Amino acid sequence: MRIILLGAPGAGKGTQAQFIMEKYGIPQISTGDMLRAAVKSGSELGKQAKDIMDAGKLVTDELVIALVKERIAQEDCRNGFLLDGFPRTIPQADAMKEAGITVDYVLEFDVPDELIVDRIVGRRVHAASGRVYHIKFNPPKVEGKDDVTGEELTTRKDDQEETVRKRLVEYHQMTAPLIGYYTKEAQAGNTKYAKVDGTKAVADVRAELEKILG
């Protein structure tokens, strides 16, 4: 089962990716992890990626596609894989298609921007332990304090409203067009496309995914 997850940052993809991996026994392929592993391995592709990144440039789509092809040929991908964070653009999706990388399901996690802002901006973390709270959905017993140690909670830089809104604008400009792209692909019979209501409780979203994926 080959799956692509689409949705804005904060739409709940990460939580459900864990569930899909465990339930269907497929690995999650994150382009960031893949690039780091390739560089570490010192392979030909890894060396190319390192040179580009060392020069402060973005790795080309061709190189990422070559790495994806190499990665999905590995033994743990024989039953499928889960792509999160790739493709991000229509040229990347086209390049994937030209490389013969097919997918069975494209799942779109649909959550309104304002709810995403609410979800992310309300997060508070206890840096030392990694415990995460939410001022509205999962508040600490004492406002601003960690339940276990009583230490001060902080807001991650990535969770500040300005940053979140900027990431949402980038998502709508770059990645949202993929929704139309994969809807057409599904109409042509090349994949199956499903929209998942990401505003529901985690367990309800999980049940919806089980229904879609079987």
Curated annotation (Swiss-Prot):
ATP binds at residues 10-15, 123, 132-133, 200. It is an enzyme of class 2 (transferase). Its EC number is 2.7.4.3. It is found in: Cytoplasm. It catalyses: AMP + ATP = 2 ADP. Its main location: cytoplasm. It holds the Pfam family ADK_lid. Keywords: ATP-binding, Cytoplasm, Kinase, Nucleotide biosynthesis, Nucleotide-binding, Transferase. Residues 122-159 are annotated as: LID. Residues 30-59 are annotated as: NMP. One of its GO terms (molecular function) is adenylate kinase activity. Consists of three domains, a large central CORE domain and two small peripheral domains, NMPbind and LID, which undergo movements during catalysis. The LID domain closes over the site of phosphoryl transfer upon ATP binding. Assembling and dissambling the active center during each catalytic cycle provides an effective means to prevent ATP hydrolysis. This is Adenylate kinase. It comes from Klebsiella pneumoniae subsp. pneumoniae (strain ATCC 700721 / MGH 78578).
